Amino acid sequence: MEKSSETNGYLDSAQEGPAAGPGEPGTTARRAGRCAGFLRRHGLVLLTVSGVVAGAGLGAALRGLQLNRTQVTYLAFPGEMLLRMLRMIILPLVVCSLVSGAASLDASSLGRLGGIAIAYFGLTTLGASALAVALAFIIKPGSGSQTLQSSDLGLEDSGPPPVPKETVDSFLDLTRNLFPSNLVVAAFRTYATDYREVTYNTSAGKVTIEKIPIGTEIEGMNILGLVLFALVLGVALKKLGSEGEELIRFFNAFNEATMVLVSWIMWYVPVGIMFLVGSKIVEMKDIIMLVTSLGKYIFTSILGHFIHGGIVLPLIYFVFTRKNPFRFLLGLLTPFATAFATCSSSATLPSMMKCIEENNGVDKRISRFILPIGATVNMDGAAIFQCVAAVFIAQLNNVELRAGQIFTILVTATASSVGAAGVPAGGVLTIAIILEAIGLPTHDLSLILAVDWIVDRTTTVVNVEGDALGAGILHHLNQKAMKRGEQELSEVKVEAIPNSKSEEETSPLVTHPNPTGPAASTPESKESVL
């Protein structure tokens, strides 16, 4: 009897008789086919990584030409087009994916998966903050740098540090953004509290200055409000039943069409990344001075990202799934390269959705439900960078942090990182909130701004890695729950098989199909134990 031919190229040679020689046409054709298949599956990954390397080489080669600001802007134009295309697709992708994802899950699954996701995001961010504080106390990045000034770095054009906000106002802004007053405005503007100083002259001749909070709208998508609205809308459509099916199908079709657009944009990613990285390297005035002056701070932040992203998060994934986390991460090289080049979790969301579904087989209902939420609220890398920066500034000012202040850093970094998405200089603004909470000056934030472009790249990679591994864990737990449900259902069916006529007569709630065949015509004979 002939065996069916396998499609695996390694098995074909064993079944087709004697092995062909290295120069024979059969072996060459098979090798060419395998190479073509490999390039077809991993071509985009190879091109994206090559774009990062080529961008670094391009920037290093052009630094000697002393390009002016206008020429650097022209050089960055292809990269700017990539960012604009990715940001263009974020709004329909987030809204449609969350509506279709929430509508495709039943209420119990939605609550269970949502609870697991919130616990995962909160605990990993808190763990990242604790790791960062521990590393900062061990390495002491601020020791010996007390005389360092931002003017020494040649980066006066990095802009002034953001005006610090009161901690209470920051959390109130977070709540306000969860419930936008206008969904159209929320697509491109975010609520933020500003301050106006009012001077009062008292009767005693004293001058009193009062800082009054004023509500303003700043540029940037209010992703928090859109996420909450899309989730609630999906649940509401699910509750409507048959009346909401038409609208659910509309959002599903809109989501699929958006993913097609994403697949087209992804082929432009290598070109855009090359010019983004190259222009940023050309733009820096003195990289060597920057690294040597703030080297310990940069090293501490990147080391924290490496430990959390390379050890802690993969270990959590392995504990829950018992699978190789690095094989899972290998299918996400394109989103990681995009995150490294764009420094934006939201801009990486389209490529992350595409790769995690196609390369890693994560259920679309899981990925399209959890990834938009993770891109908004899960900021492990940002928490590490913010906690290291807070301890660094405390050491610069010779301030010994007490236990209460350390606890405040951990809680504030974990909570305020949720609202950092969509806000310009959001990470540095969060550091200002932390410094205000523990009573430290904010004038040294310009040093953090000077190296933000370096640290922010590994920060974004760790952020999106945490989202992806969280989606993988939820996918595994959901598959496990489904198998358990099928097993329980099969056990119920086995127990419902009638064993005697009396069981059928005394079980009016269980109906059985009429048996057919010879077994049905003869009664079941049983041995009497008497």
UniProtKB/Swiss-Prot annotation:
Identify its protein family. Answer: Belongs to the dicarboxylate/amino acid:cation symporter (DAACS) (TC 2.A.23) family. SLC1A4 subfamily.
- Low complexity compositional bias: what residue ranges? 16-28
Query: Transmembrane stretches, by residue range?
Result: 42-62, 88-108, 119-139, 217-237, 257-277, 298-318, 328-348, 373-393, 418-438
Q: Which Gene3D superfamilies does the annotation name?
A: Sodium:dicarboxylate symporter (1.10.3860.10)
Q: What does this protein do?
A: Sodium-dependent neutral amino-acid transporter that mediates transport of alanine, serine, cysteine, proline, hydroxyproline and threonine.
Q: Which organism is it from?
A: Bos taurus
UniProt xrefs under InterPro entries: DAACS (IPR050746), Na-dicarboxylate_symporter (IPR001991), Na-dicarboxylate_symporter_CS (IPR018107), Na:dicarbo_symporter_sf (IPR036458)
**Where do glycans attach?**
201
Gene Ontology cellular component terms for the protein in this record: melanosome; plasma membrane
Q: Positions modified as N-acetylmethionine?
A: 1
Q: Which reaction does it catalyse?
A: L-threonine(in) + Na(+)(in) = L-threonine(out) + Na(+)(out); L-serine(in) + Na(+)(in) = L-serine(out) + Na(+)(out); L-cysteine(in) + Na(+)(in) = L-cysteine(out) + Na(+)(out); L-alanine(in) + Na(+)(in) = L-alanine(out) + Na(+)(out)
One Pfam family named in its UniProt record: SDF
Q: What's the gene? A: SLC1A4
Task: Please give the name of this protein.
Answer: Neutral amino acid transporter A
Where is the protein situated, by its record's location annotation?
Membrane; Melanosome
Tell me which UniProt keywords the record has, alphabetically: Acetylation, Glycoprotein, Membrane, Phosphoprotein, Symport, Transmembrane, Transmembrane helix, Transport
Example GO BP: L-glutamate transmembrane transport
The molecular function terms of the Gene Ontology recorded here are: L-alanine transmembrane transporter activity; L-aspartate transmembrane transporter activity; L-serine transmembrane transporter activity; L-threonine transmembrane transporter activity; symporter activity
Q: Which residues lie on this side of the membrane: Cytoplasmic?
A: 1-41
Coarsely, its chief localization is membrane
List residues, modification Phosphoserine. Answer: 507, 525, 528
Q: List the ranges whose topology is Extracellular.
A: 140-216
Give residue spans, biased composition: Polar residues: 1-10
Give positions of region: Disordered. 1-28, 488-530
| Membrane topology of this protein | Multi-pass membrane protein
